[in-house]
Amino acid sequence: MSHYEAPIRVPLIKGHKTYRDITEDIARPIEERAGKLWWISLYASLVLFIYGFGCIAYTIGTGIGAWGLNRTVNWGWDITNFVWWVGIGHAGTLISAVLLLFRQKWRMAINRSAEAMTIFSVVQAGLFPIIHMGRPWLAYWTMPIPNQFGSLWVNFNSPLLWDVFAISTYLSVSLVFWWTGLLPDFAMLRDRAVKPFQKKIYSLLSFGWSGRAKDWQRFEEVSLVLAGLATPLVL
């Protein structure tokens, strides 16, 4: 008489789906035409973008005093939003990187959203120090790059320079971490692409991914290293 043996781990994907079913589920949002809800969300985001761009133009034209920087008893609009967006980015990194280090497989359901949220948040956070300068077209002056202006050089005691190094480092690690996780999906879209232009683009994005055991071994090693680098950045 046979006895019941409980599985060692609960399956991550329920419904008895095959690899083909999983591939179809992943590729469907990209290969199918966008729905009505997507277009509504796009137009709503475009309206908010135009409004935000107008506010930034007003700030640059009027002066950053419009952000309340003349009030010494509270924080100005720029540092408040900068810290808020950095906090959102840290949350995304902790969700994805820390769960990977602790081998929590269920992170696969939310890691893409968390990593994309991190990149978007860091980019948004980087805008506020640039706008805070009052002359955003001179933002490159905060970078230690050779120039022909004589004595023009960065001030390593300035918090603006600290922001440049912090944001650029955090964005670089987060971007590579996000891109590494997308390599198998880019390769899948490359193999399914019909148009030569799409196949070429996905081939470049997938970095020659073939799905061999060696690729997966390096994929896991690099992911662990990047997660180990990203986690101290938010602590």
What do these predicted regions represent?
Residues L12-D25, G92-A114, V194-A213:
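Cytoplasmic juxtamembrane interface segments
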